[in-house]
């Protein structure tokens, strides 16, 4: 089963917006039955700018050449969240655009492992 105290939410592009909103507002705001928030959120290549003091610790990654998920929007969001004391890991990968997936064979290769380490750190 899923560890309800230590789960994480992952999303890419529009899916990253979904997990960010669930993190900020709680699952109940979207018809969920639990108020238990994720231990971490992992967001890949999204232009989501919203944030709140309720956001879970967040790992985010984007390609420097992303024309959809603007890296600067993601950078500003990460800085604002850090200012609220929320743990954040923000990564920009040179030479990549939108939709690099697992990063296999690209400069982003290994980002999934980095995200898992970030999540594990939040469970300590």
Predicted segments with their positions:
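The feature captures the conserved acid-bearing segment of alpha/beta-hydrolase catalytic domains
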Residues: 32-92
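Glycine-centered flexibility sites
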Residues: 8-11, 15-16, 63, 95, ...
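A structural alpha-helix within SAM-dependent methyltransferase catalytic domains
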Residues: 24, 75-78, 116, 120
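C-terminal catalytic histidine-bearing segment of alpha/beta-hydrolase fold enzymes
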Residues: 61, 82-124
């Amino acid at each position: 089963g899923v560890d309800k105290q230590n789960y994480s939410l992952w999303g890419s592009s529009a899916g990253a917006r979904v997990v960010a909103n669930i993190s900020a507002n709680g699952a109940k705001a979207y018809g969920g039955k639990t108020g238990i928030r994720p231990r971490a959120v992992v967001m890949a290549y999204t232009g989501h700018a919203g944030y709140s003091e309720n956001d879970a610790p967040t790992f985010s990654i984007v390609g420097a050449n992303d024309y959809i998920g603007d890296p600067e929007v993601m950078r500003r969001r990460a800085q604002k969240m850090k200012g609220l004391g929320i743990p954040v890991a923000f990564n920009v990968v040179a030479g990549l655009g939108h939709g690099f997936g697992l990063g296999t064979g690209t400069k982003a290769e290994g980002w999934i492992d980095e995200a898992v380490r970030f999540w594990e750190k939040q469970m300590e």
